[in-house]
């Protein structure tokens, strides 16, 4: 009953926004809060706010909200172009509006960076750092090889399962020209301990300062990037069967 009541309250809020409050100067943050919803009807309401609210700042917040909701519709070029258009509008109209400890402008610029640098078909950044042995290492040293770049941490959600999936991937493809490279912000002592007991037999970046995580805009763990021989991104997502299918398809070429 509580869940049904929550849904009913949310529906009433959206309906009130659609019919009464869409021109209010105070609904910008509400539009951003609605980005967690995947209902197309909600996007239409936010689009109404963007088009008809008299405040440029509210229009900009609505533009950012629309761009974030479009993110869930895939990486089709037309969708990407629409997202960039809304993000640019957000930067122009609401660049100084604060959202938590950041601003609309920073959020929008970050999303544009991801679209232009961290989507399928783009060349991945050349992560540079040191591995668990303290040796200098960078992705470009592996040019010509398929790379599975896996961001993980011992305290991530379902860590045991995630590391098990990565271990299986390493076992299946490690001898077939595929390099599994981990990136973790765990302490160097923890990383070396896991290497010593063979829990993580693959090579890992030690990223205690989070620089590589920031470079790849990592927000949730685990996350895997599959890169081809030219370091172009072919898959982004969690470890599991889709990683295997992507790797198999690339090895078959």
Annotate each predicted stretch with a short phrase.
Residues 2-9, 16-29, 33-40, 49-60, ...:
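Short solvent-exposed coil/turn linkers within tandem alpha-helical repeat scaffolds
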Residues 151-168:
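Conserved redox-active cysteine motifs that mediate thiol-disulfide chemistry
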Residues 62, 81-132, 140-143, 196:
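N-proximal helix/coil linker or "cap" segments that precede and/or mark the start of modular domains
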Residues 176-190, 200-210:
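Thiol-based oxidoreductase modules, predominantly thioredoxin-like and allied folds used
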Residues 196-201, 206-250:
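Thiol/disulfide oxidoreductase modules built on the thioredoxin-like
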Residues 145-147, 152-156, 187, 220:
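Short pre-active-site segment immediately N-terminal to redox-active cysteine/selenocysteine motifs
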Residues 1-4, 35-36, 66-75, 113, ...:
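Specific register positions within alpha-helical solenoid repeats of the TPR/Sel1-like families, i.e.
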């Amino acid at each position: 009953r509580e869940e049904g009541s929550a849904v009913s309250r949310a529906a009433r809020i959206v309906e009130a926004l659609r019919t009464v409050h869409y021109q209010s100067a105070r609904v910008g943050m509400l539009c951003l809060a609605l980005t967690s919803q995947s209902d197309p009807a909600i996007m239409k309401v936010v689009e109404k706010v963007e088009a008809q609210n008299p405040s440029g700042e509210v229009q900009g917040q609505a533009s950012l909200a629309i761009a974030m909701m479009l993110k869930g519709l895939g990486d089709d070029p037309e969708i990407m172009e629409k997202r960039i258009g809304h993000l640019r509008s957000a930067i122009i109209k609401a660049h100084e509006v604060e959202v938590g400890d950041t601003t609309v402008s920073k959020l929008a610029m970050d999303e544009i960076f991801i679209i232009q640098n961290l989507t399928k078909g783009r060349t991945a950044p050349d992560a540079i750092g040191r591995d668990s042995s303290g040796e200098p290492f960078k992705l470009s040293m592996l040019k010509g090889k398929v790379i599975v770049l896996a961001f993980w941490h011992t305290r991530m959600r379902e860590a045991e399962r995630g590391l098990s999936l990565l271990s299986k991937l390493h076992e299946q493809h490690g001898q077939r020209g595929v390099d599994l490279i981990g990136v973790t912000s765990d302490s160097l002592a923890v990383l070396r301990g896991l290497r010593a007991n063979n829990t993580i037999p693959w090579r890992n970046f030690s990223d205690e300062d989070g620089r590589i995580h920031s470079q790849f805009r990592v927000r949730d763990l685990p996350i895997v990037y599959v890169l081809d021989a030219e370091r172009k991104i072919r898959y982004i997502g969690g470890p599991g069967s889709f990683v295997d299918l992507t790797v198999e398809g690339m090895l078959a070429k």
